[in-house]
Amino acid sequence: MLHSQKRIWKKIGLCLLSFILGITVFTGSFGSKAEAAVAGDFQVSVMGPLAKVTDWNSFKNQLTTLKNNGVYAITTDVWWGYVESAGDNQFDWSYYKTYADTVKQAGLKWVPIISTHRCGGNVGDDCNIPLPSWLWSKGSADEMQFKDESGYVNNESLSPFWSGVGKQYDELYASFAQNFSAYKDMIPKIYLSGGPSGELRYPSYYPAAGWSYPARGKFQVYTETAKSAFRTAMTTKYGSLDKINAAWGTNLTSMSQISPPTDSDGFYTGGGYNITYGKDFLSWYQSVLENHLGVIGAAAHKNFDPVFGVRIGAKISGIHWQMNNPSMPHSAEHAGGYYDYNRLIQKFKDTDLDLTFTALEMYDSGTAPNYSLPSTLVDTVSSIANSKGVRLNGENALPTGGSGFQKIEEKITRFGYNGFTLLRINNIVNSDGSPTAEMSSFKNYVIKHAKPAGDGGGNPVNSVTIYYKKGFNSPYIHYRPAGGTWTDVPGVKMPDSEISGYAKITLDIGSASQLEAAFNDGNNQWDSNNMRNYFFSPGTSTYIPGTNGTAGSIQAGPPITSSDFQALPAYEMSI
């Protein structure tokens, strides 16, 4: 009897072991599937020099070396301080036309950044290009510039509190579109500068203001214009001073007493950041950046979509220090304007902008005094972007190589990045055009993932394959190669795919860089995307309709189904 019981328990134990091993294989194969690849249209770009090119032949030799080693595009700061320096609406694009011509001769694509910030004074800056001097006569310094907690005034970029921002950017974007329409075939993407160093943030960590790493930096909303905006926002939220006092536990007697934090580090060490007042301030502080992104995004879509028909992107800074400081958690991120990444990235989606994130090469080291967690931060931001269907492009924060390229490979494959841009050209190409020692590692870990021949599945080089998760039983796709001619409404019926519940279609887009499309049921019932069309890049994508009329999402690659998982092994054990 005892022997029989022992055999039973032994069999139960082995069954449990088999189950655990099976689960391990299952989850392991799921992880490898989810982390296996970049997006189907992944390409590699390299950032050009900050300062003006003076030797065009040498520059062309550098570009040719990039082309010969698998790089897709050169990314370039198009400095506002150069092109409109002579006066309001007095543009000179001649330098950048020469630049674009040189890039074209080398066989590369060109990705311009409309750089509405100053070059000089930040990490990696080797030039001095201020904003156009005439600009400051358009309004007061209090409206147009930043002021921090200590009173330092910063004019790296225009303050989002100035009402003239939209008009100035609209004029700049319109002139660029007019002057570079003839170059549209070589421009696969356009980036917008959202603030200092081209990033959507406040100038919270600026060495000239006294900042040094790893200090938290300073809040930047101490002009009278900014403080007035905060008061207005709080009055709008609560309705009256009495209700503000009730929410904050204060005894303010005048609206003028409503103010951004005035206690420096004490805002954190005293816990102010974690009470209702602190949360209201930090949420509003970020919302100013969100509104700014909406303004510049709308101006960009208005001017660029009809001419270029390409994706437009903007960048969030990888503020990775002070993240896990027990007394001042996330304080550096907060000073830069990042309080709620989920909400911030949703604004990218709502504005139909791609997201560039930086510091992909860095490793965590979360100990004092830096409390630096860049790898964790990349994971956080990338995961949120993936969940919302926001396209991702990566960058390195500092010069890198070797293990840094390995880290980049880990991130771009784990989160299905659509592109990576290396900072900067002199990291992998010498001035004489010869490759540096880092070129080999860059090719082995990053460039090798580029998709020069479409999606790798035998489709034409410039084709788009779309899997449509059926919201409509018989979906139609109304489309055009971006900038081309639309199909007749309702478009083309999408046939069923090899995957149950999905339709599928492959479309050749010729020389266009994207497919512009909308979906319907063939009977004038249209998929809602806030009255905007969807854009698909070459390669394979999966489209998932939204619910209750909300916008759908686009994910890189084909759908992941149960058949993608390795079958669980059957374990037969003798006992």
Curated annotation (Swiss-Prot):
SMART domains: CBM_25. Binds 1 Ca(2+) ion per subunit. Keywords: Carbohydrate metabolism, Disulfide bond, Glycosidase, Hydrolase, Metal-binding, Polysaccharide degradation, Signal. Its EC number is 3.2.1.2. Ca(2+) binds at E84, D88, E171. Gene3D superfamilies: Glycosidases, Immunoglobulins. Substrate binds at D77, H117, D125, K315, H320, T358, N396, A397, R424. One of its GO terms (molecular function) is starch binding. InterPro entries: CBM25 (IPR005085), Glyco_hydro_14 (IPR001554), Glyco_hydro_14_CS (IPR018238), Glyco_hydro_14A_bac (IPR000125), Glycoside_hydrolase_SF (IPR017853), Ig-like_fold (IPR013783). Belongs to the glycosyl hydrolase 14 family. Monomer. PANTHER family: BETA-AMYLASE 1, CHLOROPLASTIC (PTHR31352), BETA-AMYLASE 3, CHLOROPLASTIC (PTHR31352:SF1). Residues 1-36 form the signal peptide. GO terms for biological process: polysaccharide catabolic process. It catalyses: Hydrolysis of (1->4)-alpha-D-glucosidic linkages in polysaccharides so as to remove successive maltose units from the non-reducing ends of the chains. This is Beta-amylase. The active site is at E199 (proton donor), E395 (proton acceptor). Disulfide bonds join C119-C127. It comes from Niallia circulans (Bacillus circulans). Its cofactor is Ca(2+).
